[in-house]
């Protein structure tokens, strides 16, 4: 989610987020980009955002999810956001599985990059060879860790 938040902020969209614990390197990544990350609280949504993205680890009982439902705020899942904001019209390479997704997705993005295809990518970690976990370009290619 942090990489997507950074990409949306680069597009000029106001972003904030919540989690029960964010640690380096992701906390550093967010801080460097000026993205606030707070503990879960319904008060985080008092300003009635245009869209609430609810992660797959969030369930009923979460104060922000409950507030979004009670206040009838627009909400979606991360996959829905990715589809509508980034993936439509792209040639997507989605890496799935139990182990090795980050490494494999990083390798695919690097191979496409070094073959001049300038891919977009969204990877759960921050690969050393790419320097960031997400990049959004005008390329037809998009590598995503699924």
What are these regions (language model features)?
Residues 7, 31, 56, 60-146:
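Phosphate-binding loop of NTP-binding sites
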Residues 1-81:
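N-terminal leader/targeting and accessory segments in enzymes
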């Amino acid at each position: 989610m942090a990489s997507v938040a950074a990409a949306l902020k680069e597009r000029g969209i106001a972003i904030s987020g919540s989690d029960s614990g964010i640690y380096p390197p992701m906390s550093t990544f967010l801080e460097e980009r000026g993205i606030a990350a707070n503990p879960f609280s319904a008060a985080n949504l008092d300003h009635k955002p245009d869209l609430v993205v609810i992660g797959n680890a969030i369930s009923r009982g979460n104060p922000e999810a409950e507030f979004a439902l009670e206040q009838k705020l627009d909400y979606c899942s991360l996959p829905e956001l990715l589809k509508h904001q980034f993936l439509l019209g792209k040639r997507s390479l989605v890496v799935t599985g139990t182990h090795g997704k980050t490494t494999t997705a990083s390798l695919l993005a690097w191979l496409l990059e070094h073959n001049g295809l300038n891919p977009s990518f969204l990877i759960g970690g921050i690969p050393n060879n790419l320097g960031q976990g997400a990049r959004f370009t005008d390329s037809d290619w998009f590598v995503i860790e699924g």
